[in-house]
UniProtKB/Swiss-Prot annotation:
Sites bearing N6-(pyridoxal phosphate)lysine, chain numbering: K242
Family under the similarity heading: Belongs to the class-I pyridoxal-phosphate-dependent aminotransferase family. LL-diaminopimelate aminotransferase subfamily.
Binding-site list for pyridoxal 5'-phosphate: Y70, S104, K105, Y129, N179, Y210, S239, L240, S241, R250
Keywords: Aminotransferase, Pyridoxal phosphate, Transferase
Species name: Nitratidesulfovibrio vulgaris (strain ATCC 29579 / DSM 644 / CCUG 34227 / NCIMB 8303 / VKM B-1760 / Hildenborough)
Protein name: LL-diaminopimelate aminotransferase
Chain residues that bind substrate: Y16, G41, K105, Y129, N179, R368
Name of the gene encoding the protein in the UniProt record: dapL
InterPro entries in the cross-refs: Aminotransferase_I/II_large, DAP-NH2Trfase_DapL_Desulfo, DapL/ALD1, LL-DAP_aminotransferase, NHTrfase_class1_PyrdxlP-BS, PyrdxlP-dep_Trfase, PyrdxlP-dep_Trfase_major, PyrdxlP-dep_Trfase_small
Keyword Disulfide bond attributed: no
Catalytic function, reaction form: (2S,6S)-2,6-diaminopimelate + 2-oxoglutarate = (S)-2,3,4,5-tetrahydrodipicolinate + L-glutamate + H2O + H(+)
Biological-process GO terms, alphabetical: lysine biosynthetic process via diaminopimelate
Molecular functions per Gene Ontology: L,L-diaminopimelate aminotransferase activity; pyridoxal phosphate binding
Cofactor(s) required, per the database record: pyridoxal 5'-phosphate
Pfam families documented for this protein: Aminotran_1_2
Length: 388
């Protein structure tokens, strides 16, 4: 058999974050241990029935089985614009400022190819969703990580970035509400970031997949596009995955600066063939009619969050109370590294949590819990961890 060599861009990739965890998980499961997985952020609850019914109706229409538009149906893009106006007070032109995505991950992964040339500098706030820096590397860009530290409320210290770096930078990736830290960003942070990036002509790529999983109705996570002038420099990636329990449906959107949206569209027209049209029609119903469901979903996650936080605090494990996302970002006990601790937890208790350093160097000393099992299983999981 021929020995084919992987391209350098793949050969130099570190192992996928969850690959090593899955290997240990399989070994533990083979011993007959009851596994409770709080690792990957994949909702355990079903897509709501009204969306499923809309999908059933859409599937029955023959026209929906043809090639879709690579930018998304105009009706879908219009509903995205309607939702942004209702939720954030942001006005969008569905023809030029909205594009449909086969999940936000696809759009984020493709975006650097539209604007990053080999050697261009891209700032990536870390700990982070790995796709930001991996996609940048695939496009030939140079990555400079910007640390998110607890003493700064897991926000980047924009003033600590030298002016020369801002002058060189072509793009910055930010993500709030944040995965993995669960931090949120106030509007003032976005105002400062937009001001700097307008001054130095830096593209802002903002990942907002978790804006609808929040716990304070009086302090809802904003869109960066709420900031005057943000459209000059920003594109925002959003998804229906977490908002409506639709991770497997693969549907999302990117909105903002029309040049940035068009550039992403140019990549997509050459790389994919768009979102299955029946999924888009069901997504229109989700965006239009899903507010009550989202309110109920937040209530469930709030209960789960409180269960985990109370149990962790009783066990002496330090963590902040998250104001958004379905993650808890907790400190590992003294004397452990992140990797050592989560491996011990998995091997001795059967509970899967994620090591913080898997999201970047500043994540060392932390681990992430996903609130993606029911309350009883969460109580059992944290009880097992507390006995270590």
């Amino acid at each position: 058999m021929a020995a084919f060599k992987l391209a350098d861009r793949l050969a130099t990739l570190p192992p996928y974050l969850f690959a090593g965890i899955d290997k240990v998980k399989a070994e533990v499961a083979a011993r007959g241990v009851d596994i409770i997985s709080l690792g990957i952020g994949d909702p355990d609850m079903a897509t709501p029935g009204f969306i499923i019914e809309a999908m059933k109706e859409a599937i029955a229409r023959p026209a929906n089985h043809q090639y879709p538009s690579y930018v998304g149906m105009l009706a879908f893009r219009q509903e995205v614009a309607n939702w942004y106006d209702r939720r954030f007070g942001v006005s969008l032109d569905p023809a030029t400022e909205v594009i449909g995505l086969i999940g936000s991950k696809e759009g984020i992964a493709h975006f650097p190819f539209a604007f990053i040339n080999p050697g261009d500098l891209v700032l990536v706030c870390t700990p982070n969703y790995p796709v930001y820096h991996i996609a940048t590397g695939f496009a030939g860009g140079e990555v400079q990580f910007v640390p998110l530290l607890e003493e700064n409320d897991f926000l980047p210290d924009l003033d600590a970035i030298p002016e020369d770096t801002w002058k060189r930078a072509k793009m910055i990736f930010v993500n709030y509400p944040n995965n993995p830290t669960a931090a949120t960003a106030p509007l003032g942070f976005y105002e400062k970031l937009v001001d700097i990036c307008r001054r130095f002509d830096v593209i802002i790529a903002h990942d907002t997949a978790y804006t609808e999983i929040y716990y304070d109705e009086d302090n809802r996570p904003p869109s960066i596009l709420s900031v005057p002038g943000a459209k000059d420099v920003a594109i925002e990636f959003h998804s229906l995955s977490k908002t409506y329990n639709m991770t497997g449906w693969r549907v999302g959107m990117a909105v903002g600066n029309p040049t940035l949206v068009a550039g992403l569209g140019k990549i997509k027209e050459n790389m994919d063939s768009g979102i299955f049209q029946a999924v888009q029609e069901a997504s229109i119903v989700a965006l239009r009619d899903g507010d009550d469901f989202c309110r109920e979903l937040r209530g469930i996650y709030r209960q789960r969050r409180d269960t985990v936080i109370n149990a962790l605090h009783k066990a002496g494990i330090q963590c902040r109370v998250p104001q958004a996302t379905f993650y808890v970002w907790a400190r590992v006990p003294q004397g452990h590294t992140s990797a050592d601790f989560v491996t011990r937890v998995l091997q001795e208790t059967g509970v899967v949590v994620t090591p913080g350093n898997g999201f970047g160097t500043p994540g060392e000393g932390f681990f992430r819990i996903s609130l993606t099992v029911d309350n009883a299983r969460l109580e059992e999981a944290v009880s097992r961890i507390a006995k270590l």
